[in-house]
Design a protein with these regions (language model features):
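Conserved NTP-donor binding/palm subdomain of two-metal-ion nucleotidyltransferases/polymerases, i.e.
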Residues: 2-134, 140-295
């Protein structure tokens, strides 16, 4: 049993935000109306600012929709919030069409493209277009190993962009190159984890290669892409969160984990034997259970 003290003290805007997120992620668990009685405009503004900072602005908006009209934010803030959500929805659709187009282009050159994190994870959310993200992360490899290796396919993906006159940054990171496609930042991964930074990275990267097992997903009801298996995401999301932990874990990381739990439950691959990493997975699950009302065991 992992021991986590859950006596977490939240200020009022934090309480409000978690309540909205719980309602957004769990349609069967209505938001607490008592918490939102007699809320001042200043507190609502603080809640909105916190939601924006934590990358869950659009998701929190879904929680607001479950509140009676008399308990919702003041009209001016509500209008600004709604406009921000609408703008993000438009951006999300642009991302969906861009990644689908890029994947189809690479396919004609014998390259398989898997969408990591971001847009791919949005398929786990109740309203996919309300999962906020920044750049697009892809993993490219060979669709036919009799013709080219995975490394050759990954390099070809970059070279094809250069042939289009697109500048590719090869110094951005050890694990991926970076370029802008139709104004959207794309990170083209050759590995999943920086082997120079983390001692267990080489072993973990091999495990992630094994667990990748991509499946087809639809974005916006018409854009077909490939996303990793849920087992891959269990390991990858937890490791990604661990990387961010020292700088502070954002709520959108926790919401990603909650959506994974809500859809697939917690299934830690038997190959994950490092006790500290397993404890990280269990700790994130316990946090989601306590703060976002997921119900998966974290024992």
């Amino acid at each position: 049993m992992i021991d986590i003290t859950m006596d977490i003290i939240l200020d009022k805007p934090e309480q409000m935000l978690f309540a909205l997120l719980r309602s957004a992620l769990n349609s069967t668990k209505p938001v607490s109306e008592i918490l939102f009685t007699d809320i001042s405009p200043a507190l609502w503004q603080a809640c909105y600012k916190l939601a924006c900072t934590q990358g869950v602005m659009a998701l929190a908006w879904d929680g607001i929709q479950t509140l009676p009209a008399c308990l919702q934010p003041p009209k001016a803030l509500k209008l600004n919030w709604a406009m921000a959500v609408e703008n993000y929805e438009k951006r999300y659709l642009r991302y969906c069409h861009t990644i689908a187009e890029l994947s189809a282009f690479y396919k004609t050159h014998g390259i398989t493209t898997v969408q990591l994190k971001g847009v791919g994870l949005s398929t786990y959310y109740p309203i996919p277009s309300h999962r906020e993200g920044g750049d697009i992360d892809i993993f490219t490899y060979s669709a036919d190993h009799s013709r080219k290796s995975d490394a050759e396919a990954n390099r070809l993906a970059d070279r094809l962009m250069e042939e289009k006159g697109i500048e590719v940054d090869f110094e951005h990171s050890e694990k991926h190159s970076m370029f802008y496609y139709k104004g959207i930042p794309i990170e083209n991964h050759k590995t999943f984890i920086n082997s120079e930074t983390y001692r267990i990275a080489v072993k973990m990267d091999k495990l992630l290669q094994k667990l990748l097992q991509p499946v087809s997903a639809e974005l916006d009801g018409k854009c077909s892409i490939l996303i990793p298996s849920s087992t891959f995401n269990t390991v990858f999301l937890a490791f990604h969160a661990a990387q961010h932990y020292a700088r502070g874990l954002a709520l959108h990381h926790l919401c990603d984990w909650a959506c994974l739990l809500n859809r697939y439950g917690l299934h830690i691959p038997e190959e994950v034997t490092d006790i500290r990493f397993r404890n990280m997975i269990l700790a994130m699950t316990r946090l989601c259970n306590c703060l976002l009302y997921t119900s998966d065991a974290a024992d």
